[in-house]
Swiss-Prot record:
Domain of life: Bacteria
Species in which this protein is naturally found: Kocuria rhizophila (strain ATCC 9341 / DSM 348 / NBRC 103217 / DC2201)
Keyword rRNA-binding in annotation: yes
Record Pfam families: Ribosomal_S19
NCBIfam families named in the record: rpsS_bact
A Gene Ontology cellular-component term: small ribosomal subunit
GO biological process, one term: translation
Name of the molecule in the record: Small ribosomal subunit protein uS19
Length: 93
């Protein structure tokens, strides 16, 4: 179920303050955050936010098409290395 419209988007307060300071200064420094649950709002457009994926921070450049999504959607937590392929050349008898 999506969040109620009357509540508005959820953004962690510390992240919102960092974005507001960057907008006020007019700079575009990388903002590091652990808040994967925060929603992307129009104030974040053009910023690069480093989202934690469990072991490192993944830089995410915010574009218009990302508004309304959550930051965690753009920093995958699991690495899929593929299924093991049968090696028929190495099985010579």
């Amino acid at each position: 179920m999506p969040r109620s419209l009357k509540k508005g988007p959820f953004v962690d307060q510390h992240l919102f303050v960092k974005v507001a300071k960057e907008n006020e200064k007019g700079t575009k420094n990388v903002i590091k955050t652990w808040s994967r649950r925060s929603m992307i709002i129009p104030d974040m457009l053009g910023h690069t936010i480093a989202v934690h994926d469990g072991r490192k921070h993944v830089p995410v450049f915010i574009t218009e098409s990302m508004v309304g999504h959550k930051l965690g959607e753009f920093a995958p937590t699991r690495t899929f290395r593929g299924h093991v392929k049968d090696d028929k050349k190495g099985k010579r008898r």
